Amino acid sequence: MPLSRSLKIACFSLATTLSSTSLANETSSQQILLSYANIASDAYTATLADATSLQSAINRFANAPSAQHFSQAKAAWLTSRESYGLTEIFRLSGGPIDAEDGWVATAYGAPEGQLNAWPLDENMIDYTINDEGKRTSGNIIDTAGQFNPGGEDATAIDVSKITVTALASLNENGGDANVASGYHAIEFL
């Protein structure tokens, strides 16, 4: 009796597997691409909503600094970074985040470097404490006027007023570690 029951289970399992394989073979590449596109769209939609919440939390903190607003901004960063992290499975697919040429890059501007550039030279943004225990200088925050981030072919940028344009111009200006915008820069600050 146990052998017969085991045999039935094995046959049922085999039939289920063959049926699933047959269904998989019938699935067209269009259906697979549509599913992929829907997953990507859902992930990017969630990322945009979370990034918008992060922007609101940062604005609240900047306009009315408090421990509560700081905690809310940190929590919003964690949520936003997590949802953006899920979109990284779509990297290197020539999509709206990292396309470097063609109509997609023209339409979306390939913002991946502005969002997620790494590694980060923290000293470019604000002071750090060096190995001698002294505060460093020569960063965006303590510079009035033109700031040159250093590196290869770096261009000085006016940081008298820190604007979106100034930060975008500084980002990766002179080298990959010259990161002035995105999740890692916000995390440092």
Name the predicted role of every residue range.
Residues 13-16:
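Short, linear, compositionally biased motifs with a strong N-terminal bias
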Residues 1-11:
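Bacterial N-terminal signal peptides that target proteins for export
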Residues 25-189:
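Mature extracytoplasmic or organellar-lumen-exposed domains after removal of signal/transit peptides
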Residues 19-21:
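N-terminal signal peptide c-region/cleavage motif recognized by signal peptidases
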